Structures are given as C-alpha cells and as structure tokens.
A protein has these predicted regions:
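N-terminal beta-loop-helix "entrance" segment that forms/cooperates
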Residues: 33-57
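Glycine-rich phosphate/pyrophosphate-binding loop and the adjoining helix
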Residues: 133-134, 139-190, 197, 345, ...
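Glycine-rich phosphate/diphosphate-binding loop of Rossmann-like nucleotide-binding domains
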Residues: 4-24, 28, 153-246
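Glycine-rich phosphate/nucleotide-binding loop
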Residues: 255-354, 361-365
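N-terminal glycine-rich phosphate/adenylate-binding segment common to multiple enzyme folds
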Residues: 48-162, 269-273
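Flexible, glycine/charged-enriched surface loops at secondary-structure junctions
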Residues: 35-40, 200-208, 232-245, 340-352, ...
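A structured beta-alpha segment of the ubiquitous adenosine-cofactor-binding alpha/beta core
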Residues: 48-61, 228, 232-261
C-alpha cells in the first residue's frame, strides 16, 4: 500500500531503554505505513552535553514553528549521572526547558483497557490531570542556615520602591524557601485548561489551598474565575460542561468518590504528585498519555514515564526485556493525530487512531508486557518481550488497515 503523507512534526529522541523502543516503534509500526516527515533533535544526554543543552532550546523553538512535537523520555542528570556520563555539568531537565519556552500545561490521561480494573473501584472513566508546569517549588530559591537570625522577604520594584516582610526570627538553625509564579503564566495555564475542556467536552475542576495561602493560591483562584467568567462561561454552558473551584483536600475526597471523566487542574507540585497517584491507581505510568499544550496552540506529546534504566542495563548485557512501549506509542499517535487534525489530513488521523486500537486489542486478547500481567483480570495473560509485543501490535494493526 502507498504510504500516508504528512506535514512536518518535531521529533525529539531520548535516552536508555526508551531510545531503543523509540526506534523499534518507528521501524515496525510507523515507517512501513507513514512517510514520516520529522525535524529531528537528539535530546539524548551525550548530545545535550556536547551542545551545552542548546539542542533542548532548539527543539522547543522548532515546536513553536511546526506546532506539533513528539518526545522520547530523557534523563534528568543527578550527581551519579554526571559521573556516569562524564558530563560538563548537571544539566537541567529538558522537559523543564521545553515547558518554560512553550509556557505550556501538561495534561496526563490514563489509557484504559478492559481487564485492568482501577484500584479505586468507583472509577469508570479516565481522570485527566492538568499540571501547571511552571514555577512554584520547581523554581524556588532555598537557604539553609545554622545560626539564629531574622529571615526577610524583600521585593524591589523597577522604580526602586521596596517592600519588606519578616518571614521568621530564627532562634536556632533552620531552612528557608522562596518561590514565585507570574500572572502571565497563571493566565496561560487557565486558558490551556479551559480550551482543553472545550476540545474534549469534559468538566474542569481546579483546586488549591487559598484558605491557608491567602495571596499565592488565591491569585490562582481569582485569575481562573475571572478568565472563565469573561471568556469561557458561555461556551461551557453551550456544551453542558462545568467549571468549579474547590480546596485541594476536598478535591481529593471528591476524586476518590467520583466515576471519573473530567479534568483536574492542579498547581505544579500538586499536579506532579496527583498525576502519579491517578496513573498508579488506574494501572501504570506506562499506560498514561502526556501532552504539553500551550495557550497559543502548540502541542508536545511524550510518555509520562522515565527512561527505564534497569531494563536498559539488562538490555546492554544481551537480555531481551519486557518493557511496556504503550505510552511511547501513544505519544507518536497523539502527535500524528494532532498533525492530521491541524492539516485536515483525515488519513493520517485515522491511521493514528487505528494504531491505538491495535494496542488496546492486543492487550485485551491477553498479550502484554510483564508489568501488566500482575494487574490483569481478564483471560489468560501471556507475558511478551518488548519486541514480541510490538510485533503482535503490528499484526493487529494490519487487520485494521
């Protein structure tokens, strides 16, 4: 059959086991059917080090140009990785770099298959976590003191006016932390969430702790409410969907009692924690989609999990691993589907959706990677290696094309 043509997307390669899987997916599930048109950036740690991390910035700028990108999982180096890879320095997370440049919101949604039941038995539909991927504790300045003394927060405006507040009079050693966010980033977060809710026709919840954080968290609450009332309420009413704000502790209680089927918007740290909680309760981080959406309509798709280091070391010793490729496949299908939507290329979008269906059908037939076998409640399960599993998905895909 003739290969499907497509518009250009940004391709960002990664590290370790996911880099190996990335190539398998392209070779077996994509290249035989689609004339892949990608602008390639190697975000593997060695090349990031070689370019002084300029490649991460270049990739983000390319996403702004082409509007769609797909990213492999990457290493965020710690001290041990600096030594292992003989790095020039401890480079920042490429995800953080890309998020800061795109000013985006990360939406993570579990991939549901019959036969894997959520730990929370009331959940029937996916719960999407919208995480504000900017600022707060991730951009905090921290200080450790071993002496008594006064800690102050000082803001000096451009005109030289100074505001000063005492944080605490320390009678002994202690720790300090100062964090920030910007109105413009919170506004972008709100717009991304409201637009995503409209696109997916789902209710939107937003939670923080404004009863305790009466300036910081309340600013988030007020900006969300103001933007909703002025720009989105009418469209929400038309679609019959709802936006509401609640405290984070109340939100947790509501989530556990709910049936699912909504978007839960969270501040940066809350979203980091709750996305792992939701993914684990639904099954696995390897069964989770992740897309970074910017308010001006740029999309970056990736797997929600890491580089699967333990499997990579075993792979280097010649062992065939059973690493789950589903989230990485869905990163590709998400990007191809979005490219198809933006370009009016129905053939490309249809292919992406058929590949997703082939993945689900393969698992529901009892063929899966080892990590899913322990969660499986369906027919008898067969644990396959990554390569075997991808080839089974290919067989299912061939039936659907």
């Amino acid at each position: 059959m003739e290969k499907i043509k497509m518009g250009r997307i940004v391709e960002m390669d990664g590290d370790e086991m996911t880099r190996i899987i990335w190539k398998m997916i392209k070779d077996e599930l994509l290249s035989p059917y689609v004339e892949l048109n990608t602008e390639y950036y190697d975000l593997g740690l060695p090349y990031r080090d070689e370019t002084d991390d300029q490649v991460s910035i270049d990739a983000a700028e390319a996403i702004k140009k082409y509007r769609v990108g797909v990213k492999c999982a990457t290493i965020t180096p710690n001290a041990q990785r600096v030594e292992e890879y003989k790095l020039k320095e401890m480079w920042k997370s490429p995800n953080g770099t890309i998020r800061a440049i795109l000013d985006g919101t990360v939406f993570r949604t579990p991939i549901l298959v019959s036969g894997i039941k959520p730990t929370v038995r009331t959940w029937e539909k996916p719960i999407t976590i919208a995480r504000h991927a900017y600022g707060d504790v991730y951009k905090a300045t921290e200080f450790r003191t071993t002496k008594p003394g006064k800690a102050e927060l000082v803001f000096t405006s451009e005109d030289g006016e100074e505001e000063r507040a005492t944080v605490y009079d320390f009678e002994c050693g202690g720790v300090l932390q100062a964090m920030y966010n910007k109105d413009s980033s919170i506004e972008s977060f709100a717009h991304s969430c409201f637009k995503f809710a409209i696109d997916t026709k789902q209710d939107l919840w937003f939670s923080s702790k404004d009863t305790i954080s009466k300036k910081y968290d309340q600013t988030f609450k007020l900006i969300f409410q103001d933007i909703f009332e002025k720009e989105y309420k009418e469209k929400f009413d038309e679609l019959g969907i709802e936006y509401f704000y609640t405290l984070i502790d109340d939100a947790v209680a509501r989530v556990i009692r709910s049936k699912g089927g909504y978007i839960w918007a969270c501040k940066n740290y809350d979203g980091d924690v709750m996305s792992d909680m939701v993914s684990t309760a639904f099954g696995s981080l390897a069964m989770m989609t992740s897309v970074l959406v910017s308010p001006d309509g740029n999309y970056e798709y990736e797997a929600a999990h890491g580089t699967v280091t333990r499997h990579y070391y075993r792979y280097l010793e010649g062992e065939k691993t059973s690493t789950n490729p589903i989230a990485t496949i869905f990163a590709w299908t998400g990007a191809l589907n979005k490219r198809g939507e933006l370009d009016g290329n129905k053939e490309l979008s249809d292919f992406a959706l058929k590949l997703e269906k082939a993945c689900i059908n393969t698992i529901e037939s009892g063929k899966m990677t080892k990590d899913l076998v322990g969660l499986w409640e369906g027919c008898e399960a067969t644990a396959l290696t990554t390569e075997e599993f991808i080839l089974e998905i290919k067989k299912e895909l061939e039936k659907l094309l």
